[in-house]
Design a protein with these regions (language model features):
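Membrane-embedded alpha-helical bundles of multi-pass transporters/translocases
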Residues: 2-465
Length: 465
């Protein structure tokens, strides 16, 4: 029996475009915040890294908090859309603030300015916006194929935006003057673009009525729960923990790829190569995303596709290491593209896997926690990206890197090579290992079979007990 369809083509594109706004913040922040602070503002990489790590202590709480708040929201716009819309206003303001550290301030005041701006951006506004945006996957359709398609559209826009920002920002800043004020100007332009696109995206989709979302389920007063209970439900779901782990590892991977700006500048002696490598990363990802829905159908699920994709990614990154030590930039780009091609399917169907994880919690615990379940997207992005950026700062500081120097010691050059060549390979191997155990689709099928529920049937609360 064919599943009911809920979305038109323009709903899918409108939803997907929301990640333009998300990556205006994320790609810009993770790729260029550290170079801005160390090279233009003159702050120490190690101290910046430590401040980012401290900021992450706040994030774990806010992720669960906003996920729980979304689950409890009842408005004319729905559960998630208000948070997506209004959260981005704060994102735009604090993004500019992160790249507008007054050069006239004392050193301690500069660190304080950055820490407050960064914590508000990541711990509050980006959290509210991103969790709400991700939760829409399960709130605007109940069709599993449409959820996979939404993920593909979303990440096509995400990687296209990331590609564009990584490719043009260095030149854009140089044209604006190349100093700290130039970074502020670029941040303002990016923030305005993100605000406009986020608004259009939120208004392009409509959440299903709660009655339709809960169709076939028995209303149960015990379904109400607080943030502490929501946290316990998440921890009991091993697949949620796996997804959090892969998200964190992916962001650590991304942080090391972002640190490529140092590798290109000091080791390869050409900072403009960073933009060229961005093409090698993002174009194959986009190609893979286009074919992900078809491959999911062909292989009757996401598990095999994701695992095989990351086997290819590991092979690709291993060959990047070989090419790097050979000193061949063309081969490095070619193998970077191969690795990215393998990473693409997981990016495309990740949201659908999270929806399956939410179903797993309902089948095992009898509780609906869709909004809270999607906290893993924000939690993983922020913790992984934040720790990754912090590690970059710590490693650079440890190696003796000083951003304002005309030359760098050999220890710093060796560290840049380790960060850009070896660490991405290590993180890909770890992700492959986790994905080899993330077969939540089969787990749900077995649970439904045990409870006498048809595989394509809407889960009824009375069947859980």
């Amino acid at each position: 029996m064919e599943e009911k369809k809920y979305l038109k083509w323009y709903n899918k594109i409108g939803y997907g475009s929301g990640d333009i706004a998300g990556n205006v913040v994320y790609a810009f922040l993770t790729s260029f915040m550290m170079p801005y602070l160390t090279d233009s503002v003159g702050l120490a990489a190690g101290v910046v890294g430590t401040l980012i790590a401290v900021s992450k202590l706040f994030d774990g709480f806010t992720d669960i908090f906003f996920g729980s708040m979304i689950d409890k929201t009842h408005s004319k716009m729905g559960k998630a859309k208000p948070w997506m819309l209004y959260g981005y206003i704060g994102c735009a303001i604090t993004l500019v603030s992160c790249f507008a550290v007054p050069v006239s301030l004392g050193t301690t005041a500069k660190y304080a300015w950055f820490f407050i701006s960064y914590t508000l951006l990541n711990g509050v506004f980006y959290t509210a916006n991103n969790i709400a945006y991700s939760a829409l996957t399960s709130l605007i359709t109940k069709n599993s194929k449409e959820r996979v398609q939404m993920g593909s559209y979303r990440f096509i826009f995400a990687f296209s935006t990331s590609l564009l920002i990584q490719a043009i920002t260095v030149g854009f800043v140089d044209k604006c003057g190349g100093d700290a004020a130039a970074w502020r100007t670029v941040a303002i332009i990016y923030a305005i673009i993100g605000l406009v696109v986020n608004t259009i995206s939120a208004l392009s989709v409509k959440e299903l009525p709660e009655e339709e979302l809960n169709e076939g389920e028995v209303k149960d007063d015990n379904e109400k729960y607080g943030m502490v209970q929501a946290f316990k439900l998440l921890v009991k779901n091993k697949y949620y923990m796996m997804i959090c782990g892969t998200y964190i590892l992916q962001q650590l991977y991304g942080a090391m790829i972002g640190a490529g700006i140092y590798y290109m500048t000091w080791v390869l002696k050409n900072k403009n190569l960073f933009g060229q490598f961005a093409w090698a990363v993002n174009i194959p990802l986009i190609i893979a995303l286009i074919f992900t829905p078809t491959l999911v159908g062909k292989w009757k699920g996401m598990y095999k596709l994701n695992l095989r994709g990351y086997v290819l990614a590991v092979i690709g990154r291993a060959l990047v290491v070989v090419a790097g030590y050979m000193g061949s930039v063309p081969l490095m780009m070619a193998f970077t593209a191969l690795a990215a091609l393998g990473q693409g399917p997981w990016q495309g169907d990740m949201n659908a896997v999270i929806a399956s994880c939410s179903e797993y919690t309902y089948l095992t615990q009898g509780k609906r926690i869709d909004g809270t379940m999607y906290s893993c997207t924000s939690l993983g992005v922020k913790i992984g990206g934040g720790i990754g950026t912090a590690v970059v700062g710590w490693l650079l500081e440890f190696s003796g890197y000083i951003g304002t120097n005309a030359t760098q010691p050999q220890s710093a050059l060796d560290m840049m090579q380790f960060m850009y060549l070896w660490l991405p390979l290590i993180f890909d191997v770890l992700i492959m290992f986790v994905l080899s155990r993330m077969n939540v689709e089969d787990a749900n099928k077995k649970l439904k079979a045990e409870k006498g529920i048809a595989a394509d049937e809407v889960t009824d609360a009375s069947d859980i007990n």
